[in-house]
Amino acid sequence: MTELPERSAATTGGAKTARDVSSLIAELGLTAEDSIEPTALVPPERLREVALALRDRGFMLMDTVGVDYGAFPERIPARFCVLHNVYHIKDRCRLFLRVWLEEGQALDSLYPVWRAANYLEREVYDLFGIEFVGHPDLRKILTPDDLEGHPLRKDFPLGESPTLFREGRFIDPPAFRAGLSGQNAGLTGWRGEFRRGERGDRVPPVLPEGGPQ
């Protein structure tokens, strides 16, 4: 059997790579966040500059996500953050860039740096309402054009749609929630305090007055 040569730590994501990433964060003049994955805190005004430096070192943009920390119990710098996931294929090295944003604050688009930012930033805009300055076509990508608001914001109202199942069962959201709390049969037809593994009396779901709407 032919033995494969051992890969160096720099190409296997080992300790050397971790030290290299820490050194890179410091070299860029950024602060490292205390987290499981290497994460750098990037001031909004420096994002494109940092992205260009990383691209020139061989990093590519893998993903961009938004987070709404509204009602988060711990103290945080701002309500929103945009997290860019960049990766160096040759070194198998990953780095996250976290940018904190206040309500209504826009962020420079990374489309001029990585074309992959096109759809990624459109998704963040659609779901959180965060605008990206310099994006060539910033518009919705997932939700209908006539939907008002941004669904992944914490202040977005939760919608409810009655559901008619193929076998004729009908359930509406209030009944579903009541079933989960044991107040009535709910979605599954089980009633009472028997939802933790104990069998109770099986009760057929009750259709609303007038039948399915």
UniProtKB/Swiss-Prot annotation:
Tell me which EC number(s) this protein carries: 7.1.1.-
Q: MF terms per GO, please?
A: NADH dehydrogenase (ubiquinone) activity; NADH:ubiquinone reductase (non-electrogenic) activity; quinone binding
- Cite the entry's keywords alphabetically: Cell membrane, Membrane, NAD, Quinone, Translocase, Transport
User: How does it sit in the bilayer?
Assistant: Peripheral membrane protein
Q: Could you state one GO cellular component term attached to this entry?
A: plasma membrane
Name the catalysed reactions: a quinone + NADH + 5 H(+)(in) = a quinol + NAD(+) + 4 H(+)(out)
* Compartment list: Cell membrane
* Pfam families assigned to the protein according to its UniProt record, in alphabetical order: Complex1_30kDa
Q: List the disulfide bonds.
A: none
Classification via InterPro entries: NADH_DH_suC, NADH_quin_OxRdtase_su_C/D-like, NADH_UbQ_OxRdtase_30kDa_su, NADH_UbQ_OxRdtase_CS
Q: Which family does it belong to?
A: Belongs to the complex I 30 kDa subunit family.
Q: Which PANTHER family match?
A: NADH DEHYDROGENASE [UBIQUINONE] IRON-SULFUR PROTEIN 3, MITOCHONDRIAL (PTHR10884:SF14), NADH DEHYDROGENASE UBIQUINONE IRON-SULFUR PROTEIN 3 (PTHR10884)
- Describe the function of this protein: NDH-1 shuttles electrons from NADH, via FMN and iron-sulfur (Fe-S) centers, to quinones in the respiratory chain. The immediate electron acceptor for the enzyme in this species is believed to be a menaquinone. Couples the redox reaction to proton translocation (for every two electrons transferred, four hydrogen ions are translocated across the cytoplasmic membrane), and thus conserves the redox energy in a proton gradient.
Q: Output the HAMAP family linked to this UniProt entry.
A: NDH1_NuoC (MF_01357)
Summary of subunit composition and partner proteins: NDH-1 is composed of 15 different subunits. Subunits NuoB, C, D, E, F, and G constitute the peripheral sector of the complex.
Please identify the protein, giving its name as recorded. NADH-quinone oxidoreductase subunit C
Source gene?
A: nuoC
